[in-house]
Amino acid sequence: MKIDITDYNHADEILNPQLWKEIEETLLKMPLHVKASDQASKVGSLIFDPVGTNQYIKDELVPKHWKNNIPIPKRFDFLGTDIDFGKRDTLVEVQFSNYPFLLNNTVRSELFHKSNMDIDEEGMKVAIIITKGHMFPASNSSLYYEQAQNQLNSLAEYNVFDVPIRLVGLIEDFETDIDIVSTTYADKRYSRTITKRDTVKGKVIDTNTPNTRRRKRGTIVTY
């Protein structure tokens, strides 16, 4: 895949280059993970697969000594149960859920930062939040990168948060052959049990025209 990034509060100056390299390399070599939708308006069409994407990232980072599912201290557990990944002073959240969850990630990252909470035997200094681009068809109301940019830009304009954040968007080029991992689950919406998984070629078709006023998501096809 390809990535786009937006930094807040000088994250580019604070982020450890080696830790970022491990994240970047993982994302750049990752294939696009898809599954068939079961939502009424797009039954059977291919959409972004958050479960497969999360698992790929986990399988790549844990062997590099990134901690996974780091428990949130009890005094802060009103904001959730755990952090996706962490290493040294860096926190990573993979956010493909509904768009309001970005604010939760931001607030708790701010709290962890200001309280100097230990991530991996070091106080937390910077957060990386990974999202998907708007170009990918996805489950209704799930967060996308451009939306996250708008939210964080507005918050940053009024100095709502001080924690350094690197926002990452997963993207691809339209109309270009790419590697795709297509997965079928035991239950299309909630299951993590894989019944079939294929690695194929495919592309994301641009469904926009020069006259399109509001950018539409692409269509994913495999062959």
Curated annotation (Swiss-Prot):
Signal peptide extent: none
Q: Does the keyword Transferase apply?
A: no
Cofactor note text:
Binds 1 Mg(2+) ion per subunit.
One GO BP: DNA restriction-modification system
Q: Which organism is it from?
A: Bacillus subtilis
Gene3D superfamilies hit by this protein: 3.40.91.20
Q: Which UniProt keywords apply?
A: Endonuclease, Hydrolase, Magnesium, Metal-binding, Nuclease, Restriction system
Q: EC annotation?
A: 3.1.21.4
User: Know the name of this protein?
Assistant: Type II restriction enzyme BglII
Please name the InterPro entries in this protein's record: BamHI/BglII/BstY, Restrct_endonuc-II-like
What cofactors are annotated for this protein?
A: Mg(2+)
| Domain of life per record | Bacteria
Annotated Mg(2+) binding lies at D84, V94
Q: Give the quaternary structure.
A: Homodimer.
